[in-house]
Structures are given as structure tokens and as C-alpha cells.
Amino acid sequence: MTETPPAPPPRTASAILAALAALFVGVGLARFAYTPLLPAVVAAGWFGPDQAAYLGAANLGGYLLGAIAGRRLMAHASRAAPLLMLATAATFLACAAPLPFWWFVLWRFVSGLTGGALMVIAAPAALRIVPPARRGLAGGLIFAGVGLGIAGSGILVPLLLTVGLGAAWATVGALAVGVTVATWRGWPPDIAMSRGDTVAATTGRPWPLSATVLIVVYGVIAAGLVPHMVFLVDFVARGLGAGITAGSGWWVVFGASATVGPAIFGALADRIGFDNALACALTLQIGAIGVLLISTGPLALALTSVVVGAYVPGSAPLVLGRLREIFHDPVRQQIAWSRGTIVFSLGQAGSAWLLSVVFAHTGDHRVLFGFGAGAFALALLLDRVAAVIDARRRHTV
């Protein structure tokens, strides 16, 4: 009879909780709480629709810089992560009053900067003390922090907006402070990191072309997710005229799906392999986004919210798993994942700025979703190219 693996020791559980909290604050709240806030910002007259969309793009631009800078903080995660979380909380408090547009751009950029750095350092810091047999489950729990932020903001923000827009910003900031303080001592001790293995990994064997193509796929995936991440609530609230409450309701569905997405896609990969699971997931995204081009009824909104919501955090374990299949060296795996995170950030930032310009000129949400479906079609094509290249590489080894 197979024995159930023992529960993680308290120190491991605290580290997992701390990393989950970091992604909850740095990504779940810092990025996704803005989605239900966006139509309220427009309705309150703080900014116009085009300016409000640019604020979402500013966050993604900061995320790119944070992902690049985050590698330098990995050796100091136990000290850097809580400070980054507090800085994230400060960005909400700074936006609690109708101040000039440049002020909001600055703080939304900072919130992206801290979130990108937390995405790079949080999970590795916690997972290095988790037993190998439990890292899959632990990773799923950590990335669930993103989904919890999406779902939590979808429930909390509409309630706070009944008090006032400024109160909503300030309360989300206070929540981020509370979560940071509660998990501060959960981070595991830092360890010194040597540059020797990294230098050897980057200057030794040639870099596989299949890995490069896969990293590009991850960037295209990021671009395809932006229409839902930034514009879904605004599409329902203003585009369909259903109101902020309805838009936030679908955002809760989106977030609830995001909390379980990594585990679902991970289980699928365990059954059919990461290669096939990634192809299936990309195909699902094409249909789930494309359905909005032909229908905006409840069933279409449910399908798109559930499927795309699950894939926002669920894409990470699939791409990471494929990279681990390509690279058996842990150092090269880490380098590849770092590069993938940076390219993902580039895809998000570039897509966000492009779509903000498009939306400012057209005001048509369906153009944005058409872009998303097209991006996933391109990602699927490139993924199949990467699979063929990798198969040939393995055959010649």
C-alpha cells in the first residue's frame, strides 16, 4: 500500500505561505485589483477611459523592469520580499486621492516593479526548502496567491466602492500591509549563491533552439492574456452596459478559476506530458477568447472567464515543466526560467501599451479580444515548431 507523503514541517509551511502572500500582494492585488477599479476610476471622473487604460499598461511596464532586477535580489529574498510587499502597499495608499495623472502613472509603475521582482524571487526562495516529492503541490499553492488576489479583489472592491473610490484604494493598501506583517517571519534564511555554476552553464554547451522558441512562446502567451487581465471588467461594465457589479462578478469567477488553474494544468501534464498539455491549453485559449467575437451571453462570459482565468497563473507551471524537459541541469533550468519571465514581462508590457493605443482610438473591446485569440494561435504554431525541433535534437543526441 502506498503511504501518503507526510505533511510539510511548520517551517516549510510558513515559507509556502509567505511566498503565496508575496504573489497575493505583488501580483494578485497590485495588478489585478486595478481591473475592477478601472471602470470606477472612469465613472468618478478621475481620468478618461484612455488614460485609465494607460495606467494598467504602466503597471506591466514596471513588471518588466522588476523581473529583470529581481535576479539580483534572489540571494536576499528573506529581507527583500517583505520590503517589496510594503512598497506595493504604499502604491495603493498613494492613489487614494484624485491627484494628477503623472502621479498615478508613477505609482502604478512602482507597483509593477515590485510585483515583477516578487514573482522572480518568491517561489524559488520557498521551494528550495520543500522536499522534492512535494514541490509540485507547493508550487501550485504559491501561484494560487495570484488567483486569490483576483477573486478577493473582485469581491472586496465593489463593496468598498459603495463607501468611495479613495476608500477602496486605501483599504486594499491596508490589506496588503496586514498580509505582509502576518507573514514576515515565514521567509526561510537566505543562502549564499555562487556565480561559478552560472558562468559554466552560460558559456558551456550550446543553447538549444527549442528552448529559445519556447521562451518566445511564453512571451506571446503573455501578450494574449492582456485583454482579459486589463479589460475584462471594463468590457462587461461599460462595453456591455452591465455595470461595475456585474463586471466584478465575472472577475470573481475569473479569479476563482485562477486559484485552481495551476493545479489543474499540472495534473493534466502529469497524465499526458507537459508538451501535450501545453498544446491542449493553448488550443483551449483560442476558443475561450474567440467566443467573445461571436457571443457575449452568460455562457460565453462563463467560458471565457473560467478557461482564461485558469491559464493566467496556469501557464507558468506548463512552460516551466517544458523547460525542465529540455534542460536536465538545474542551473540551466533556472537561467531559462529567468529569461522566460523577462520575455513574459516584455510580452505583457508591449501588448498592454499597444492595446491601450488601439482602445484609445477605437473604443472597441472586441478588437482587443481578437488580438488575444490571434496571439494564442501564433503561440500554438510556435509551440509545435519548438516540439519538432526538440524531438529532432533528442533523436540526434
What are these regions (language model features)?
Residues A87-L99, L284-T296:
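C-terminal ends and interior cores of transmembrane alpha-helices
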Residues A117-V130, G314-H328:
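Intracellular juxtamembrane helix-capping segments at the cytosolic ends
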Residues P132, L137-P188:
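Helix-loop-helix hairpin linking two adjacent transmembrane segments in secondary transporters
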Residues T35, A211-G255, P262:
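Extracytoplasmic gate region of multi-pass secondary transporters
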Residues W102-S111, L299-V307:
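Paired small-residue
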Residues G66-S78, G261-G273, F359-A360:
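Helix-to-loop junctions at the C-terminal end of transmembrane segments
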Residues W107-G145:
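Cytoplasmic helix-loop-helix junction between adjacent transmembrane helices
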Residues P330-T362:
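A late C-terminal transmembrane helix in Major Facilitator Superfamily
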